[in-house]
Curated annotation (Swiss-Prot):
Presence of keyword Isomerase: yes
Keyword Isomerase in record: yes
Catalytic machinery residues: 11, 89
Pfam families the UniProt entry points to: His_Phos_1
Biological process, per Gene Ontology: gluconeogenesis; glycolytic process
InterPro entries named among the record's database cross-references: His_Pase_superF_clade-1, His_PPase_superfam, PG/BPGM_mutase_AS, Phosphogly_mut1
EC number in record: 5.4.2.11
Name this protein carries in UniProt: 2,3-bisphosphoglycerate-dependent phosphoglycerate mutase
Function comment: Catalyzes the interconversion of 2-phosphoglycerate and 3-phosphoglycerate.
Quaternary data: Homodimer.
Protein family according to the UniProt entry: Belongs to the phosphoglycerate mutase family. BPG-dependent PGAM subfamily.
Length: 231
């Protein structure tokens, strides 16, 4: 692994991915395929002799467990891991827990695609009395209630992801650390869009597959150059 690279990985397939549900901040488990995907991602990394100094993930177990499977395969289970809500999947608001096909049937393919892929359009929001409100979960008890999302667009997701990159991850990169980030489709989309200046229309077409390592390349000044999938 080169010192000017960062590896991003979306978690393996979850039980709610299989059920075709909007997952968001719901803490879905990896299914068997997702566990196998995580192990295969690690095999790809091992084949290319990747070795990490730092690892980051979200507070959701589908990402945490994916990272654990990868570190186990790489014989790096001892590695210190930083976990942050800022790397969580986007919050899908009132869509969380609903079947995607049923939502399409109700609202139409075009509207659902805008909710899922556009930059600045949020899904319908929940309220703080909704059982899905993350403020009911002790893992978010340290957050100001006004920081807890009720439903996010990609733009809102980016507003929490990018500060984490700037304040936590980028200083590690500047210090030539080899970094692995295991997170979620939309938190990673937000980061890639920010780093590689993808316009708001083009980001509609970016869909990140489960457990497919993404290699971010940086120049010697730690400016992003290009990104590609490891296959």
């Amino acid at each position: 692994m080169k010192i000017n690279q960062v590896v991003l990985i979306r978690h393996g397939q979850s039980e709610w991915n299989t059920l075709n549900k909007f997952t968001g901040w719901h803490d879905a488990e990896l299914d068997k395929k997702g566990k196998d995907e995580a192990k295969f991602a690690a095999i790809l990394l091992k084949k290319e002799k990747f070795f990490f100094d730092c690892a980051h993930t979200s507070l959701l177990k589908r990402a945490i467990h994916t990272l654990q499977y990868i570190l186990d395969e790489l014989n790096q289970t001892w590695l210190s891991v930083k976990k942050s809500w800022r790397l969580n999947e986007r919050h899908y608001g009132a869509l969380e827990g609903l079947n995607k096909d049923e939502v399409i049937e109700k609202y139409g393919q075009k509207q659902v695609l805008l909710w899922r892929r556009s930059f600045d359009i949020s899904p319908p929001q929940i309220n703080i009395k909704d059982k899905r409100f993350p403020g009911n979960d002790p893992r978010y008890s340290h957050l100001n209630i006004h920081d807890i999302p009720l439903g996010e667009s990609l733009e809102k997701t980016a507003k929490r992801v990018i500060p984490y990159w700037n304040k936590i991850v980028y200083p590690e990169l500047k210090n030539n650390k080899k970094i692995l980030i295991v997170a979620h489709g939309n938190s990673l989309r937000a980061l890639i869009q920010h780093l590689y200046k993808i316009d708001n229309k083009a980001i509609l077409d970016l869909n990140i597959p489960t457990a497919q390592p993404i290699i971010l390349d940086f120049d010697n000044e730690k400016n992003p150059i290009k990104w590609h999938y490891l296959t």
